[in-house]
């Protein structure tokens, strides 16, 4: 083993400890910008579609199904660890398990869990216990988005994926509270995804009365704003429908 913990340098120059990540070392804009630049599916989409936008859409789905700011924020940060370790695709993990055994996958789960905990604590949250029903809302949204994104942003697959596709609910634009041609459902370039992610964070932390890392970070006015059209679409997506 190494004499000291492995760490990585963030965009802003600080070193981030991967073994004992501290909530105070989590820079929220570093997550927002890095996830906006990180492409889903190993950047193999037809055009840039980011991890940041994926998380925003997950937050929208969970919000519309629960109307709980906290759960929606958890959905909106469920892949935030990828800002530090990248998007290690599931087939790659399976290949590593094939070559080196289950210890590799177990180690990756442990690493992700540590990072997730530090990121959540930056927002004054703690990880949910395994049996918490909120986990199911988040995992359902993640699986459903996987299939929706594949159809919308990738080429037609040359064979079946190793997933029970028939068991997964097929999303439509209505699930997001949006029209089919909404720009929010189009693949956005990194600079728009960066602003989109911050819009989600501001919206959910303000609505829940949670400040956490946002209040402690640099001047919020210097952070990216979302263009007005996308901001209006976010208003629609996060609107609470009142039954007549």
Each model region followed by its residue ranges:
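Metal-dependent phosphohydrolase cores
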Residues: 1-244
